[in-house]
């Protein structure tokens, strides 16, 4: 499982002309689910989303010390199978991505665990397997790329 985590001032997802998810200050998280992902991969990404310290303390004197829960932030969780690409020449190939029916179950499990371990009203999502327009107001910018198969 891969995740691109961005610190944002706000974010929204529009699908079929309707805003389907939006947040204020927090994290926008793009998630790619691989064919061989397990519950352990989901748990790793979950822990990182909730635990990653990308905000300073309140007076700004110490950087990288607070996570999304500590700032009472929100999470915009968006499925993005294209993160699982491999390049075949100049063309991306997505055979490493989990099939949509199975990926939806994994994505929903991640969403539900985030809501359970943080707060249901703090977790917004896009529409799974739909074309979406994503609008973000990046803060920093701060962007982190995680891969559950390459843990540090």
From Swiss-Prot:
Coiled coil: none annotated. Its EC number is 3.1.1.96. InterPro entries: Daa-tRNA_deacyls_DTD, DTD-like_sf. It catalyses: glycyl-tRNA(Ala) + H2O = tRNA(Ala) + glycine + H(+); a D-aminoacyl-tRNA + H2O = a tRNA + a D-alpha-amino acid + H(+). A motif (Gly-cisPro motif, important for rejection of L-amino acids) lies at residues 140-141. GO terms for molecular function: D-tyrosyl-tRNA(Tyr) deacylase activity; Gly-tRNA(Ala) deacylase activity; tRNA binding. It comes from the Eukaryota. The keyword tRNA-binding applies. Belongs to the DTD family. Homodimer. This is D-aminoacyl-tRNA deacylase 1.
